Amino acid sequence: MLIILTGLPSVGKSTFSKAFSKKMAEKNIDNIILGTDLIRESFPVWKESYEEFIRDSNNYLIKEALENKFSVIVDDTNYYNSKRRDLMNIAKECDTNYVTIYLKAPLNLLLKRNIERGQKIPNEVIKNMYEKFDTPGTKYAWDLPDITVDTTEKIDYNEILNEILEINENKNLKIEEDKIPKSEPVESDLVKIDSLTRNIVGNLIKTGKIDKKDIKLLSEIRKSFLKDCKKIESEKLDFEKIEKDFLDYLNKNLK
């Protein structure tokens, strides 16, 4: 079974996944927590050039775990419905069920929690992600979450596990082809560019190369760059050039 978590930074995904994993183990359900951040944090330094390897490695580990009959908890933001769709398709490829869990909390609480844990991610980035977040089920019926968890309230892990086991028993595994769409190349490329530029910005802030007072401006510059990228034809996209162009664009507009 593939358990897909989705939710913004500081909503409590890691806390939830660890507690839920332990609860599954108590019921003798072999499981593992996987996610891109777990791989990303294994590097001594971050480089944008690592991102494709990180994504591919995470997908490979998920597939291997599912094929070896482990239940997998995916601890990632999965803030775009396309990311959730790709995970659903992995479950389908591995002939296993998936369950989506949407963890939510108000923006003001997310920002407060982020400050309390040392602002690993700048609050301005979380605000930007909050604005762009594809709330599960608001666009497509296939994206409706199986379970929604309000992390401002006490979480009953036993109840959630029982609900998941029931869903797993009753859910039709052989989903028809048209229920979960395949990735559209243009959309997929734009998601990659969004992720690429977001990681570059996050790294610049984390390493202190950008002054905190410029974070809001940096976010606006990134948005402007992404708008320009939408005009590029998919077959003409060169991600190495886009990375260089984005850094040049930042240098030019931050002066």
UniProtKB/Swiss-Prot annotation:
Family annotation (PANTHER family): PTHR12435
NCBIfam families in the cross-refs: selen_PSTK
Gene name of the encoded protein: pstK
Name this protein carries in UniProt: L-seryl-tRNA(Sec) kinase
Family: Belongs to the L-seryl-tRNA(Sec) kinase family.
Recorded metabolic or biological pathway in which this protein acts: Aminoacyl-tRNA biosynthesis; selenocysteinyl-tRNA(Sec) biosynthesis; selenocysteinyl-tRNA(Sec) from L-seryl-tRNA(Sec) (archaeal/eukaryal route): step 1/2
Functional summary from the UniProt entry: Specifically phosphorylates seryl-tRNA(Sec) to O-phosphoseryl-tRNA(Sec), an activated intermediate for selenocysteine biosynthesis.
Catalytic activity: L-seryl-tRNA(Sec) + ATP = O-phospho-L-seryl-tRNA(Sec) + ADP
GO biological process terms on file: conversion of seryl-tRNAsec to selenocys-tRNAsec
